[in-house]
Regions:
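Hydrophobic, aromatic-enriched alpha-helical segments typical of multi-pass transmembrane helices
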Residues: 1-193
Length: 193
């Protein structure tokens, strides 16, 4: 798959975290956890498309740490998707396996913050594109702040969903329009003296 295809798929799935709250009434024939498993699978799979494109662009650099970081991100997202699939097949399951797999949702968000920082440091994406993965990664600290300010209620959920739809859509658009160009750029790693 080329980056244009990956970006298109990512853009199609990026708003599903937000859309799920509007779409749930139309899927009343599904158990609510099956519904969350369905939209979660679409959302996480779209995110995986963006990360695969970052990998193709070598956005985290060509060093071992940068390459491993994106493989870890893809692995964390795949494990998070396993929890979505469990919700689809066995709604209501609260086994230890589900709890462990479900923990990869927040862990993948936390790891995306590290990915975003690494992309900024490596400076392989030009201009504003360099900061987009960091924008996505900032979802985690924004949610921590919101939970401390507003609790785990509707306000935090709304902020999480809107932030997610905007940031992940910008990431998808960045991937869509960057094409393959960044792969050819020489690394101009930022030096902090």
């Amino acid at each position: 798959m080329n980056n244009r295809t990956l970006g298109t798929l990512a853009l199609a799935g990026a708003p599903f975290f937000l859309l799920s709250s509007f779409l749930q009434p139309y899927f009343s024939f599904l158990h609510h956890q099956q519904f969350y498993g369905l939209w979660g699978t679409i959302y996480i799979s779209a995110w995986m498309c963006s990360v695969a494109a970052l990998q193709r662009l070598k956005a985290t650099g060509e060093g071992r740490f940068g390459r491993i970081l994106l493989w870890m991100q893809l692995s964390f997202l795949l494990l998070a998707n396993f929890s979505n699939w469990i919700q689809l097949v066995m709604p209501g399951d609260r086994s230890l396996l589900f709890i462990v797999l479900d923990s990869f949702w927040p862990l993948s968000n936390l790891l995306m913050l590290v990915v975003g920082i690494k992309v900024v440091i490596e400076n392989r994406l030009q201009g504003w594109r360099r900061f987009v993965p960091l924008l996505v990664g900032c979802w985690f600290p924004v949610m921590i702040i919101c939970m401390n300010l507003f609790g785990r209620g509707g306000t935090t959920g709304t902020i999480a969903a809107v932030y997610s739809a905007i940031a992940w859509s910008i990431l998808a658009v960045m991937v869509l329009f960057t094409g393959e160009k960044a792969r050819e750029l020489p690394s101009t790693k930022l030096e902090f003296a």
